[in-house]
Amino acid sequence: MPKNKQQEAQEKRLQKNIRQAKKTGADAKQGKTKSARSKPSKKGGFFAGLKADAPQTVQQSIPYREMYRDGICRLTDTLYTKTVQFFDINYQLAQADDKAQIFEGYCDFLNYFDASIHVQLTFINQRANMQDFTRSIDIPPRGDEYDGIRKEYGDMLKNQLQKGNNGLTKRKYITFGIEADDLRTAKMRLERIETDVLANFKTLGVQARSLNGLERLELLHSQLHPDGQEKFHFQWSDLPKTGLSTKDFISPSGLSFSKDGKTFRVGDHSGAVSFLQILAPELTDRLLADLLDLNDAVTVNLHIQSIDQAQAIRNIKRKMSDLQKMTIEEQKKAVRSGYDMDIIPTDLATYGEEAKNLLQDLQSRNERMFLVTVLVENIAAKCQKLFNDIFAASGVAQKYNCALKRLDYQQEQGLMSSLALGTNQIEIERGLTTSSTAIFVPFTTCELFQEGEALYYGLNALSNNLIMANRKTLKNPNGLFLGTPGSGKSFSAKREIVNVFLLTEDDIIIADPENEYGPLVQQFGSQGQVIDISPTSTNYINPMDINLDYSDDENPITLKSDFILSLCDLIIGGKEGLSPIERTIIDRCTRLVYREYLQNPCPENMPILGDLYELLLKQSEPEAQNIATALEIYVNGSLNVFNHRSNIQMDKHRVLCFQLKSLGKALKEIGLLIMQDAVWNRVTANRSKHKTTWFYIDEFHLLLKGQTGSFSVEIWKRFRKWGGIPSGLTQNVKDLLASREIENIFENSDFIYMLNQAQGDRQILAKQLGISPHQLSYVTHSGPGEGLLFFGNVIIPFVDHFPKDTLLYSVLTTRPDEVAGTKA
């Protein structure tokens, strides 16, 4: 039967496809002999384990030979590994652009590892000893009148601890291993890899540190003692004394595996290891984060083995050749049967397109191929809790179209592969490209739980964990409390004041323009003093007060003269300020007025404003008479409240509160400036005693204009050096950006406690601090005590709902209805 034109055309296409398939097959075969020789040997998986001698002791099960002091571990005759601990960054809260940048940086990080390096990422959520946590937040009694407040505050902290899951410690590690003939060769290469790994983490903005041998043993000990009760006791000097090996110091009391091959027992705890079967066509960066967000003891391990790029390309070409052969067979059938040869099984067409795209990714898009094993280890004190935890983890996997499969009869291999040693005994691997592997982003959100003199700042809104931080550890401990009226600014600052008072020996000074802090300071009894500054008050502050530590240099008069110039400028400067002649006269008289005090520094010789006034009258220049006349109302007139020697014993009280509400308009700005100088005097005196001074300024926007604004900028620049920690409270964010000089206050504040913000202020802050839209949602129509904490490079959303049924709450609150209820 003669062929029609369509059949002839199909046969020509078929012959062309056959020739193309042969060419692809030839490309795939190139280097086949070589790759067969260089193919790595099989790992010791389940069946290999059956053939080998079964371990008789726990020590024999732990798969390493020797741990060295520098952190290098020898697993076999030729395999050496090292471990680096890394810490979290705010990935989930970051802006979309920042997320993309972190993801791309992490892809580059993975691409660094070639086929000769095995990588293991270990994420450990482990139950810690609750007694240790409680001890770290405990405020011990001191046998004084404040123990009642200490107990109430301590009980509040313990109650907040119960709300969160601070019983879980979260740690992240990367272990990398290489093959080497001897330790010396391994050491050189591992140290080079370690340097590159740390540099790559630094590029990502991630803090990381290498573990030494002792720290690696402590890590293994914690993994093999999941209850956290047994402490790790080991020194290198113990080895020759006892004749034991390092394994003896980290091994649990017992290790057994169930007959059904599904669980194991380590010490008093039950556990099970599962592997993640990746079925989803597309993965999301939330999968790993959600697994680690489970409030359970879980360890997730990613074993990553890079494939040589040329080998990966050959493998794909070989697969494409196989697919083409299958396609040709289908096309032959179609031609023989007389139907269209383009009608082939859907799967063949799909697989062919996927293989083509994968080849293109490897050849032109900076992608590599990795073999990835994802292991999930659950551990619990009771079997029922273990099964519940596994069910919860399986639910997370199913949510993202994956499956969590138990490692039946491979629990021992799974457990050992979950230790941060860098060995994978499970031969269940999934091939993934760089971007598919990087979707398991190892970053979620930061936690902030410092020890020592750490203060309480609420609960992490994402994890419900306690936020405990020590501002003294910051490069710039200066702080700002920002929020709309009623958002909880004053309450938060007062809570911090109480915490500082109870936990430290530091001094606290409060600038209180609205007279809100008096009841709190009175709770501190003899250690607190409320100082009312007003025209009718009998509390006096001498603006001429000075101490010999007032300045860095040997002559404190230079800096004091600068303050008095600012004071006079405020009084008589007008719009144009003091003239050069007036400034010269004031500076001259300042130096003269302190001459007697410097010769004999006793309180009786401390000058007052009237002494400066008298000196000005004696000067010959007419400008001096003008200055004296302007000062007269503050010396002999109705505003002479600041023309007295100080009668406040500031150094006798730890907490001072300057109430400024009654000053009136005429004295308000002058009073604020004089108060700032009095605070500076206290800070400089405290520095010589090695004592920190905390300075809180409510309604901070009042001190951001004119001379007080300049003085505030100086405080923010210089206080840290003198042991001072200033904090400003304001709802007027725009005032903080009124000038480039005032804007420095923002840049010199590493602590920002941001509560609910008005619409205009939100946009300003987002631009100034680089806040993502998701982060901004935490300060948009948020409730009292809810917002964002900026602590150095860490940004954490917080919630602080202080218990209302306490004495402390009644003195901390500033809500009118609650204050009225307290008074009633």
Task: Give, region by region, the residue ranges found by the protein language model.
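Hydrophobic positions on the alpha1 helix immediately C-terminal to the Walker A/P-loop
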Residues: 492
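Conserved P-loop NTPase
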Residues: 769-823
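Extended, folded cores of ATP/NTP-driven motor/assembly subunits in large transport
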Residues: 2-443
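Conserved lysine of the Walker
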Residues: 489
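Post-Walker A helix-loop "phosphate-sensing" segment adjacent to the P-loop in P-loop NTPases
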Residues: 499-509, 528
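Hydrophobic anchor at the beta1->P-loop junction of P-loop NTPases
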Residues: 481
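A short helix-turn-beta junction within AAA+ P-loop NTPase domains corresponding to the substrate/partner-engaging
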Residues: 525-531, 741-754
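P-loop NTPase motor domains
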Residues: 89-90, 96-115, 126, 290-292, ...
